[in-house]
Amino acid sequence: MNKNLRFTQMMIGISTMALSFGSIQTQVSAEETAPYNILQMKPMGTETSKDEIVHATKADETLNFEERLKIGDFSQRPTLVMKRDEIQLKQSYTLAELNKMPNSELIDTLSKISWNQITDLFQFNQDTKAFYQNKERMNVIINELGQRGRTFTKENSKGIETFVEVLRSAFYVGYYNNELSYLKERSFHDKCLPALKAIAKNRNFTLGTAEQDRVVTAYGKLIGNASSDTETVQYAVNVLKHYNDNLSTYVSDYAKGQAVYEIVKGIDYDIQSYLQDTNKQPNETMWYGKIDNFINEVNRIALVGNITNENSWLINNGIYYAGRLGKFHSNPNKGLEVITQAMNLYPRLSGAYFVAVEQMKTNYGGKDYSGNAVDLQKIREEGKQQYLPKTYTFDDGSIVFKTGDKVTEEKIKRLYWAAKEVKAQYHRVIGNDKALEPGNADDVLTIVIYNNPDEYQLNRQLYGYETNNGGIYIEEKGTFFTYERTPKQSIYSLEELFRHEFTHYLQGRYEVPGLFGSGEMYQNERLTWFQEGNAEFFAGSTRTNNVVPRKSMISGLSSDPASRYTVKQTLFSKYGSWDFYKYSFALQSYLYNHQFETFDKLQDLIRANDVKNYDSYRESLSNNTQLNAEYQAYMQQLIDNQDKYNVPKVTNDYLIQHAPKPLAEVKNEIVDVANIKDAKITKYESQFFNTFTVEGKYTGGTSKGESEDWKAMSKQVNQTLEQLSQKGWSGYKTVTAYFVNYRVNAANQFEYDIVFHGVATEEKEKTTTIVNMNGPYSGIVNEEIQFHSDGTKSENGKVISYLWNFGDGTTSTEANPTHVYGEKGTYTVELTVKDSRGKESKEQTKVTVKQDPQTSESYEEEKVLPFNTLVKGNLITPDQTDVYTFNVTDPKEVDISVVNEQNIGMTWVLYHESDMQNYVACGEDEGNVIKGKFAAKPGKYYLNVYKFDDKNGEYSLLVK
């Protein structure tokens, strides 16, 4: 029976690298041709670095959010806190070499080597086919695994990890290739059950030494690729219990966390696969009611309590798997009960909270244990407002950044200008700047950047995409997701990764027809080597020095010439062995610098969607011994001179304040220096500055052929940029340029269309629109709140439309609307106004909605509040509100601050005795401090400190 769920085999090249280890490059399992993407329940393979930017899967590109939730695995891997040492392996083996050995020699060899000494695990070729077609040999390996399971010790794992990886590779390759169809059958997977049980019955099967942890990890991984039964699941209970009982010690131990993760993931994966393959319900399976102890230990993980940086991944997994496995408990509502407890236990909008809500939506009909409906869409929108509150627009809205509040404006500006450097070099090389399919979502490029790796984990909940990576681009949405990082969190800077991913955007829009993963050109990973190496190559783009090799790429090339990729290996690389990124970069860098006509032809064939001739040309290049020799020599040259290279990044010239300069003058100077004809200038508006493009036609000298003409043109454009930079205006140091549409005229002269882009600093027309929302507001559930836009005006036109977004999914186009909220809480209200020139301006304010109005009885328990004295209080259900009073005798400024000790949903509002319906001040959140100042007039004031969710917490209050 196949572990094949809803989808036919997807493009393997569309990977979402499956491992999240604190952004540190770590290899902890055997390599595969396509890293396991949990969004499709295909066989599990290898795990990779979180540093890398990845492409989406076909599921990511085609399914809606709810469908992705149903088929996805949004578990979270433990975080590695130490960078591994590089291991230099003494000898490598191919499966062809292993296949020539008699069984006794094979077993002896496998017992002495590491799995990563076998170079072609998880790859399908004639050699791997021959190795895995031998059923007798497979049985020998399985039986030997059982023998070693009985005899491993605390100090010696007996090579169990290597035997397991060889078997996992078999099941993985068998899944994708009909020639090995017997390896797809569950009946054959079940042959591993005796070996698994032999391992588990060994008294050393527990968390402990590094060797023991390694065996436990292998046990979980093999179950995920092979199969389980109730007995193998029960054997795992003691491992989980041991981990839970020693959580305070083990939570910081990566190896033990990894072992527990693989155990739970592997068992869940096998059980969920069985449901899909058989179309059975949980209560119709062997596991129903027979694995309660295992589920109970998972539930313990879900309800650990206090979330820390060390245990957040663990808690999230506990909730996730408690929801999925709960239906197999003898009490089928146990899972719903646990995730409801988790939802109420953890902070609202935290990762744990989102995992609980998603499990309710995905597995329990969108209701909690008490039958209350949860509105996932509303919660998701609240999460986006909290984690991605900032929006920046560029180029008339064609580039949009949505970011966390700690991503600096300077970083956004740098990324914008980095995109322009990459774009200029990219269009030069491909010779085209027209979208292949205008009207797609990528007409507007959206870049979503979270504050840090931890908050990036929320992207799974907010947008529904994998986060075990350094970032992911979804072409179907025209959106790129990533996060800000520190040098300790990633070996690459955000700008470096952004340049890589921006190249993928350019590829999809200007070079490769069709959406990512669709069409014949994408099949069989034809473009894997090209697109990833191409992105690494163009990440080295500069403003005036073409595209240069990046030191970070060169350092990834092997120091051993015999270990470097050949041209053939590079051209036929597939996802799985991530070294190919570096080697494909090196090959494309070589072609760019020394065989541009070859580089150009490859791209022409791809853009023309000429699959037949692309295949033929790639095959021809792969067998070109001269090309391979020159490629090897080029890599050696890079390695020998790597200290001379760096990692290109935008200079501070882009960020300085440039003097105003009329655009007409800019155009004339560019036309004069560049010697172009038929020039036109276009201005574009961005949030921080405006930009321009100058387009024209350049006529060169006598044509010497396209390749030589291109080189001459590139040199000429670089010289033009340098000449412009020597002029007095600093804005010329922001100018990039590219040329497209090569042709030769009747006089045998080459011609190009040329485009310059840079900052525009002419004096701006005053276009300010003042949006006045007259907030913040407060009100009562189910009672009208009056909103006002008085004071809103346009300085250079008149306001012609209003759009209020009340933050609860409803809107109004009135200037001064009323609105009724159905639920208590704090809402963000946004007002968008448009003036007679079509310009839009926005502003936001807060509205606090309480459950019950304050009556005169509410103040019977008022507490007198002294000035300049710290007061402690708490809000514990059913106590929703604390009321304090203080008197002001003379006009003065009063400063109120409340420290929200447990970060519950709480705030404060202040009333004057003369008007108990309209407050005079309210708190604004600054971290966990709720602050406010106001000019007080004499009289008595009532300070209401209240909570608006079900959490309990303490606070400290100071009025001065």
From Swiss-Prot:
Required cofactor names: Ca(2+); Zn(2+)
Induction remarks: Expression is under control of the plcR regulon.
Calcium listed as a keyword: yes
UniProt domain PKD: residue ranges: 768-849
Keyword Secreted attributed: yes
Signal sequence range: 1-30
Name of the protein in its database record: Collagenase ColA
Species in which this protein is naturally found: Bacillus cereus (strain ATCC 14579 / DSM 31 / CCUG 7414 / JCM 2152 / NBRC 15305 / NCIMB 9373 / NCTC 2599 / NRRL B-3711)
Gene: colA
